[in-house]
Amino acid sequence: MSIWVCGEVLIDVLPTGPVVGGGPANTAKALARLGYDVDFIDGISSDAYGLSARKELDRDGVGLSLALSSDKPTCTATVTLDSAGSASYEFLIDGTATFDFNASWLPDPERLKPSVLHIGTLVTIVEPASTVLYDWAVKC
């Protein structure tokens, strides 16, 4: 069974330091750790954060052949904790590799078909990525 996970990989900038995050990236890593054949689809930056994300996804067994290597920066989510320990997030989205979806680099659904397609989370609401992915997904 082939599973395609499409969506953001980003860097959570925590008070203790940066870590690779993003709901879809975490989903892909979890599925790969469970032994599934998983390919991740997203724009991944060639900056230091992007290279760190690629390394972690690869280490966990996530296929990256369908991911786009981009010169744009990695999306970040800066995490702030209040006095009760509740988190708030400030996202750097605009102009990042993470949301640079273009139909020209997405896999051709006429040639390749996954058994399962998972699309989440922020890419489903951030334009133009959400429209590009919706139009592509209905063909899968």
Task: Outline where the language-model segments fall.
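Ribokinase/PfkB-type carbohydrate-kinase core domain
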Residues: 1-3, 56-58, 64, 83-140
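Substrate-binding N-lobe of the ribokinase-like
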Residues: 3, 15-77, 81-86, 94-98
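Generic enzyme active-site microenvironment
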Residues: 6
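Catalytic metal-binding/acid-base residues of hydrolase active sites
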Residues: 10, 45, 123
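General secondary-structure edge motif
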Residues: 11-12, 36-37, 120
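Short, solvent-exposed loop/turn segments at secondary-structure junctions
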Residues: 12-13, 126
